[in-house]
Amino acid sequence: MEISLPIGTPRSFDNYRDSFTHHYSANVFYDALKREISFAKREGNLVGVVKFIVPIEASADQLLYFANELELAIRQHDLIARLTEREFVVLLRFDSEVIEACKCLVQRIKNMERREFKFAWAISDGTKGLEQLLQELDNPQIHHSSKSL
């Protein structure tokens, strides 16, 4: 007996993509970030990560809407991942002006998203390792509210 899923309901059970938003999983993000940090160290480039935190009271539909806004706001070569239930990250790569790219991404999301969210970004030239970059992103002192700036 063959069971078929309705068209338009993709499922992912391979831990490569998040099954709810279909963005990359945390494992894929960590691997990509390690590669980009190594590349930045070798080539003298910068790598940037922007973290977005959606409020705890956001519904499932609002999370999907935010995930879609991220997808529309990024450049083709950037990578979106969902780290936790309410945390998304965007890996900005292949850009000489990473700081400006971080600012532009946040501004594009602010223009589309009416609800409040928090964000932070961290930049590395390869001298900061994966753990240092992630700790910097988790520092609540650098988290900004979308309504305060």
Residue ranges and their predicted role:
Residues 57-65, 89-108:
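Short helix/loop segment flanking the catalytic signature motif in cyclic-nucleotide metabolism enzymes
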Residues 45-55, 80:
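Active-site-flanking beta-strand signature of metal-NTP-handling nucleotidyl enzymes
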Residues 60-65, 99-100, 124-149:
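Catalytic cores and conserved motifs of cyclic dinucleotide signaling enzymes
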Residues 48, 82-93, 112-140:
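A short glycine-enriched loop-to-beta-strand structural element that forms part of the catalytic core
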